[in-house]
Amino acid sequence: MTTSLFTQIRRDLHQIPEPGFAEVKTQQYLLDYLKKLPQERIEIKTWRTGILVKLAGTKPKRLIAWRTDMDGLPIVEETSYPFRSLHEGYMHACGHDMHMAIALGLLTHFTEHSIADDLLFLFQPAEEGPGGAWPMMESEEFAEWRPDCIFALHIAPEYPVGQIATKPGILFANTSELYIDLVGKGGHAAFPHKANDMVVAGSHLVTQLQSIISRNIDPLDSAVVTIGKLESGTKQNIIAEKSRLEGTIRTFSMESMALVKSRIESLVKGVEIGFDCQATIDYGVGYCQVYNEEQLTTDFMQWVQEQCDDVTLITCKEAMTGEDFGYFLKEIPGFLFWLGVQTPYGLHHSKIEPNEDAIEVAIRLVSRYFTWLSQQE
């Protein structure tokens, strides 16, 4: 096994980013690679555009799972790569290409080196939306190979290569999409008194929504309401009949999520009355928090500090990031950690270029951890 192989795999995958539950080329690429591995100890199942691979251990006491995401993002790539995306308007801007290369590296390692416990590798589609974790967990394929513990990583542009970060307990927030549609009465710009202007109504609602965090959420708690898109109107001299707001809600507690949604609904009702319009609210896709099981995470962090001279561990703070891996952790003990890839551009940026040296770091670290974990009672 050579690390350059998995760098090339990452580059191949980088060229074929696909939307959630449409990762057809990605799935086929992964299956083609899996077929080249020694088949004696592995079983392969497909689920929609995802893949489950079970690898038999020598004396299994448990089933240890590793999960990677697969999908790309609707972003026009602006990197300097010679291996830029071949799918116009889509890009691997969140590191899922690296995540998959690392997963294949781990799987390959354990086809060449024995391990006591059984391993399960989950190639999960649709992390960016509409969410693949929960339906995968509900599948018959997953039920037959339900793991005893589960782990994952995510690239982190802000950390240097060779550095990882995590913490016990809450790591990522609860998230919910937010879509609000307002419908009033359009008309000629010269006669505003004969129309109900949804540009004004939508703008008013945006400012009202910003009061939720400052005036309704405990200052010692954390929450975010962001409106990322406001769309209204057709021409400069036409009063807009419709307005659409698109945004996101993020909280660390489910209580705060419920409170934020309640306040949104109250404010929207106020806009309906105040601007004589009709409104609908859609919360779209929502993910539960990523909660790292305390004991497993603490033991992992201690193991890294004591056994891994080539990796630096940082105890990080919670982040408002959303990740549907949280659904796995809601029912199965495990954790997620950040993997340093040192790049000036952040996640979901069109110019992000993660340092590929991190692939080798991750494969080496996790393979050693799994070997150690499988030796524990």
From Swiss-Prot:
Catalytic activity: N-acetyl-(2S,6S)-2,6-diaminopimelate + H2O = (2S,6S)-2,6-diaminopimelate + acetate
GO biological process, one term: diaminopimelate biosynthetic process
Pathway involvement of the protein, from the record: Amino-acid biosynthesis; L-lysine biosynthesis via DAP pathway; LL-2,6-diaminopimelate from (S)-tetrahydrodipicolinate (acetylase route): step 3/3
Regions that span the bilayer: none
GO MF annotations in UniProt: N-acetyldiaminopimelate deacetylase activity
Originating organism: Brevibacillus brevis (strain 47 / JCM 6285 / NBRC 100599)
EC code(s) of this entry: 3.5.1.47
UniProt KW Hydrolase keyword: yes
Key word Amino-acid biosynthesis present: yes
Keywords for the protein's UniProt record, in alphabetical order: Amino-acid biosynthesis, Diaminopimelate biosynthesis, Hydrolase, Lysine biosynthesis
Family according to the record: Belongs to the peptidase M20A family. N-acetyldiaminopimelate deacetylase subfamily.
InterPro entries, alphabetized: AcetylDAP_deacetylase (IPR023905), Amidohydrolase (IPR017439), Bact_exopeptidase_dim_dom (IPR036264), Peptidase_M20 (IPR002933), Peptidase_M20_dimer (IPR011650)
Residue ranges that the Swiss-Prot or TrEMBL entry lists as coiled coil: none
Record's protein name: N-acetyldiaminopimelate deacetylase
Pfam families registered for this protein in UniProt: M20_dimer, Peptidase_M20
Function field: Catalyzes the conversion of N-acetyl-diaminopimelate to diaminopimelate and acetate.
Active site (UniProt): D69, E128
